[in-house]
Amino acid sequence: MRKLSGAAKRWIGTSETKNNVEFSNPEFKDYIKQGGHTPGAPYCASFAKSCALESAETPTERKVIQQVLTPHSLTSLANAKKAGLYSSTPTPNSIAVFQKGTTQSGHMAVVDSVNPDGTISTIEGNIGAGGGRE
């Protein structure tokens, strides 16, 4: 998925106009629907999955994405581990999953770059106005 970041970057600047239902770019709603988004639900994972599907280079890669990634971040993480696709080392054009403590709540993002200090720069859907993850 060498083009994953590129797929995500084209949506930078898109914002919600109605909480997890309507967006400043009407095409975005249909885009995240490909990733399994249902109106009103958090859409970070659906956004990442839609970007992955767009950047898939082979039918086999597309099939794996459909099987592993879901609209729920932590379910996707469990699926990736089970499929042998998990790595704790982030790389550009990969997907990062964050867990909120020990809860079943998480967040998913596209890794754009890994910085020299080890932090990552991401492109995300469904972040709050103050930058917080939803």
Language model features: what each stretch is:
Residues M1-T58:
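N-terminal capping segments
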